[in-house]
UniProtKB/Swiss-Prot annotation:
Enzyme Commission number, as recorded: 3.4.21.-
Source lineage: Eukaryota, Metazoa, Chordata, Craniata, Vertebrata
Highest taxon listed in the record's lineage: Eukaryota
Major location category of this protein: cytoplasm
Protein name, entry field: Prolyl endopeptidase-like
Coiled-coil stretches noted in the UniProt entry, renumbered to this chain: none
Active site: 575, 661, 707
Primary role: Serine peptidase whose precise substrate specificity remains unclear. Does not cleave peptides after a arginine or lysine residue. Regulates trans-Golgi network morphology and sorting by regulating the membrane binding of the AP-1 complex. May play a role in the regulation of synaptic vesicle exocytosis.
Protein species of origin: Gallus gallus
Length: 732
C-alpha cells in the first residue's frame, strides 16, 4: 500500500504493535494461505502477525545481599536452575512430540481426505486469481511465487520482465514482504522474510537492462524512498523498532541515524504520503501517537514534529495542497475523525474537523486521492464506502454488497488516479474485484463471470445480550439446504483483543464445511474492533471479563435459536484469542465439546509479570500492569486460562504450537497442556462414573513456521489436522 492509513487503521485502531501483527497475540491467520500469488506489494506493514507476543528469555539473575564467599554459590545455583529448566523443557518437548506421533496415526486417513477437498476448492476458486498490480508511471509491478515482475502499462501482449527472484538471489524459502520503487524507477527496494523468523532483510536492486543488487540491509522493518536515491528505513531488534536511518545511493554513499525512540512502549515505522511530499516517522504505543515529518524536497533536513504525543490520542498524517489531513481519535466522541491543518501550523490547537465517524462505526481503511478521500466502514455488520469530495465538500455513502464481510484495498501509488480498486470477500465467498470511479460516481464489479457467487450459503446477523445488557454482534453462515440445524455441527470463532476484527476473509476450508452442513459463527466480542475504538476499550485491561461474558452470551443465543447444541459445538481461536477461548473452557465447559487453538496466549499473568520480555511493557496498555497494580494482578488472575484450570470435565482440546515462535513461547503452552491434562485426569478419577468421558488434550508442535506465516503446504496440513480432530470429537 502506498501510505500508512491502511496499516495505520488496522494497527493503531487496534493498538497492535506490528501488525500485521496479531500480537501475542494477534494472529488472524488461522487457516490456509494462498498457495500461489502470495503477494505483499500492498504491504500490510502491520500484518496479522507483526504484532507481538513477548518472546521468551531467561530472567536476569538478582543477587540480594550475598556475603563474601557466597557469590559463587549464587552463580552455581543460577546455572543449575537454568540447566534443570532446560532439561525439563527438552524432556517435555520430546514427550509431546512422541505423543503426537502416536496419536496422529488415527487422523491420517481423514486428514488426507480433507486435504484433497481443500486443494480442490483452492484450485477452483483461488489458485488462478491474478496477483495485485501496482501501476507506477508507465509500468506495472507485481509479485508472483517469489518473483518481482514488471510490464508496460500499455502492453496487452503479456510481456513481463523479471526484476528479482528470491531463489536466484540466494533467498530460497523467503517470501517477499514489501516492495518500494524509487520515484524515477531506477531502484527497487524489497524486504524478504523467512517462515522461521520475524526479522526481514531489505534488498536494494538497481534496475536497468540487467538488474543487480546494490545493497543488502539486515533487520529492516519498514522503508520508503524520500527521493530518487535517498532511502529511509527502520531497524528491528527483538521485535521492536526504535531507530530510523537514512542511506544514500549517490556517488558519496553514507548511512546515518535520524531518529531514536526512547520509550519502550512505542514502536516506530515510516511511510510516504500519497503525493510523495513528506515521509512520516510514526511513533506509536497502543494508545498514543507522535508523528515527525521529513520534507522529500529537502531529505537531509531534520524531521519536524507535527504534534507532541498526548496520552490517549492516536493520529496519522497525510498531505494535500499544503495541508495535513490527520486521521485521529482526538476529541469526543473517542472514535476516528478526519481533520486538517496547515503545514505551517500543525499543532493540535489548529486541527479543523473534516469528517467524524458515527459511534459504533468501524473505520476499516482509508485511502487518499488528489481530490477525494475514500473511507471503508463497517456498521451493524455491513460494509460501506464513504467518498469525501474535498472540492465540493460533500460526502457520499454507498452500501457494499450484503454478502461481503471483508475487503482488501489495492495499491494506488498515483494519487491523481480517477479510480479506486478493491476486493470484497467473506469466509465462504472468494474475492471479487470492484472499482469506484470518481468521474462516473459509480461502483462497478470487475470480471463478474470469473468467480461465481456462492449461492448455497445463507448469512445471518444476530445480536446477543451480554451480562451487562450490551448487544454483541454475531455473523452466522450455514447451508441454505440444511434441515434440523440443531443437529448440525457448529464452529464458533472468537478473538477479542487489540481492537482487531475477526479474520473474515475467504478460506477454502470454511466453504468446505458449509458444503458439508456445518454452521459457522463469528462472535464479535468486546476487545475486538468491530464496533470502533470504544468497542476495543470496553474489552481491554479492567474490562477483559466483558469479552468472556460476550462469548458466553453468543454461544448460548446460538443454541437457543436452534443453531446446533453443546455436544456438536466447537470453538476455534488464534493467538490472543486463546485468552477468551481458554477462559470459557474454565468457566463454562459444558457449552463446548471441542476446541482448536493455534499458538494460543494462555498465560497472561506470568507473561505480564516478566518485564524483561521485549514486548511486555508495550502490552500493558492492553492487559494492564500487574507488577505495579495489585488490583490488576488479581483481575488478570481471575480470568487467565492457565491460573484457572481446575478438576472438571473439559472439552477436548487440540493445540498447534511452534517450536521457534517468537511471540508465543512454547514453554508456556507446554505448562498449560500439562496442567490441563492433570486436571482432566483428576476429575475422572474422582467421579469414577461408568462410561465417564475423558477429553483428549493434544499438542501438535511444529518445528518450523509460526502462527503468523507458514508455507502453503504446512498451513494446509495444519488445517486438515484441526478439522480431522473436530470431526472425530463431534462424531460427524
Amino acid at each position: 500500500m502506498c501510505w500508512t492509513a491502511k496499516s495505520f487503521v488496522r494497527w493503531l485502531s487496534s493498538s497492535v504493535k506490528y501488525y500485521p501483527k496479531d500480537n501475542h497475540l494477534q494472529a488472524l491467520c488461522l487457516c490456509t494461505k494462498t498457495k500461489l500469488n502470495k503477494c505483499h506489494i500492498l504491504d500490510w506493514s502491520r500484518s496479522p502477525c507483526n504484532s507481538a507476543v513477548p518472546p521468551g528469555r531467561i530472567l536476569s539473575w538478582r543477587l540480594f545481599s550475598c556475603k563474601e564467599g557466597t557469590k559463587d554459590l549464587c552463580k552455581r545455583e543460577k546455572i543449575a536452575s537454568v540447566t534443570a529448566s532446560e532439561l525439563l523443557y527438552k524432556d517435555l518437548l520430546k514427550s509431546e512430540q512422541e505423543n503426537w506421533n502416536k496419536i496422529s496415526r488415527s487422523y491420517k486417513a481423514m486428514t488426507k481426505r480433507i486435504k484433497e477437498k481443500i486443494e480442490e476448492l483452492h484450485n477452483k476458486y483461488t489458485l488462478h486469481l491474478e496477483s495485485p498490480r501496482m501501476r507506477f508511471g508507465g509500468n506495472v509491478y507485481f509479485e508472483e511465487n517469489g518473483y518481482i515482475l514488471c510490464s508496460k502499462a500499455d502492453d496487452d501482449k503479456g510481456n513481463v520482465h523479471i526484476l528479482f527472484s528470491t531463489e536466484d538471489m540466494g533467498f530460497s524459502g523467503a517470501y517477499i514482504k514489501r516492495i518500494r520503487i524509487s520515484p524515477d524507477e531506477r531502484y527497487l527496494a524489497t524486504s524478504l522474510q523467512s517462515e522461521n523468523s520475524e526479522e526481514a532483510t531489505c534488498v536494494i536492486m538497481k534496475l536497468g537492462d540487467v538488474p543487480f543488487v546494490e545493497e543488502v540491509i539486515p533487520n529492516v522493518f519498514s522503508f520508503e524512498w524520500a527521493t530518487n536515491d535517498v532511502l529511509y528505513y527502520t531497524s528491528q531488534k527483538n521485535l521492536k523498532c526504535q531507530n530510523v536511518f537514512m542511506t544514500t545511493f549517490t556517488n558519496e554513499k553514507y548511512t546515518k541515524l535520524v531518529y531514536t525512540e526512547q520509550d519502550a512502549r512505542f514502536f516506530v515505522d515510516i511511510y510516504c504520503t500519497k503525493d510523495r511530499r513528506f515521509l512520516t516517522i510514526n511513533s506509536n504505543s497502543k494508545t498514543t501517537s507522535e508523528v515527525w515529518l521529513i520534507d522529500c524536497r529537502h531529505p537531509f533536513k531534520l524531521p519536524v514534529l507535527v504534534q507532541a504525543r498526548t496520552k490517549g490520542v492516536i493520529y496519522h498524517v497525510e498531505h494535500r495542497n499544503n495541508e495535513l489531513y490527520i486521521l485521529t481519535s482526538y476529541g469526543e466522541p473517542a472514535e476516528y475523525k478526519l481533520m486538517k491543518a496547515s503545514v505551517a501550523s500543525t499543532g493540535m490547537e489548529n486541527w479543523q474537523l473534516v469528517y467524524a465517524l458515527e459511534e459504533k462505526t468501524k473505520l476499516i481503511d482509508l485511502e487518499m486521492f488528489r481530490d477525494h478521500c475514500i473511507m471503508f466502514l463497517q456498521k451493524a455488520g455491513y460494509l460501506y464506502l464513504n467518498v469525501i469530495a474535498f472540492v465540493s465538500h460533500s460526502v457520499q455513502s454507498i452500501q457494499l454488497p450484503t454478502w461481503a464481510c471483508a475487503f482488501e484495498l489495492e495499491s494506488h501509488p498515483e494519487h491523481a488516479s480517477s479510480t479506486c480498486y478493491f476486493q470484497l470477500t467473506s469466509p465462504v465467498h472468494p474475492p471479487r474485484r470492484f472499482a469506484y470511479s470518481f468521474k462516473e460516481n459509480n461502483l462497478i464489479e470487475q470480471a463478474a463471470e470469473e468467480v461465481p457467487i456462492i449461492m448455497n450459503c445463507h448469512t445471518t446477523r444476530l445480536l446477543a445480550k451480554s451480562k451487562d445488557e450490551t448487544l454483541v454482534p454475531i455473523t452466522v453462515f450455514h447451508n441454505v439446504n440444511s434441515k434440523e440445524l440443531h443437529r448440525k455441527p457448529l464452529l464458533v470463532h472468537v478473538y477479542g483483543a487489540y481492537g482487531i476484527d475477526l479474520n473474515m476473509s475467504f478460506k477454502e476450508e470454511k466453504l468446505m464445511l458449509i458444503e458439508e452442513g456445518w454452521i459457522l459463527a463469528y462472535c464479535h466480542v468486546r476487545g475486538g474492533g468491530e464496533l470502533g475504538l470504544r468497542w476495543h476499550k470496553d474489552g481491554c485491561q479492567q474490562n477483559k471479563l466483558k469479552g468472556l461474558h460476550d462469548l458466553k452470551a453468543c454461544i448460548m443465543l446460538l443454541h437457543e435459536l436452534g443453531f446446533s447444541q453443546p455436544k456438536y459445538t466447537a470453538l476455534t481461536a488464534v493467538s490472543a484469542g486463546g485468552v477468551l477461548a481458554g477462559a470459557i473452557c474454565n468457566s463454562d465447559p459444558e457449552l463446548i465439546r471441542a476446541v482448536v487453538l493455534q499458538a494460543p496466549f494462555v498465560d497472561v499473568l506470568n507473561t505480564m509479570m516478566k518485564t524483561h520480555l521485549p514486548l511486555s511493557i508495550e502490552e500493558q496498555e492492553e492487559w494492564g500492569n500487574p507488577l505495579a497494580d495489585e488490583k490488576c494482578m488479581k483481575y488478570i488472575k481471575n480470568y487467565c486460562p492457565y491460573h484457572n484450570i481446575k478438576p472438571q470435565c473439559y472439552p477436548s482440546v487440540f493445540i498447534t504450537a511452534y517450536e521457534n515462535d517468537q511471540r508465543v513461547p512454547l514453554t508456556g503452552i507446554l505448562r498449560y497442556v500439562q496442567k490441563l491434562r492433570k486436571a482432566t485426569l483428576d476429575h475422572a478419577s474422582r467421579t469414577r462414573k461408568k462410561g465417564n468421558w475423558i477429553p483428549n488434550i493434544i499438542l501438535d508442535i511444529q518445528a518450523s513456521g509460526s502462527h503468523c506465516d507458514s508455507s502453503w503446504e504446512d498451513s494446509l496440513n495444519e488445517v486438515a489436522r484441526h478439522l480431522a480432530f473436530l470431526k472425530k470429537e463431534l462424531q460427524v
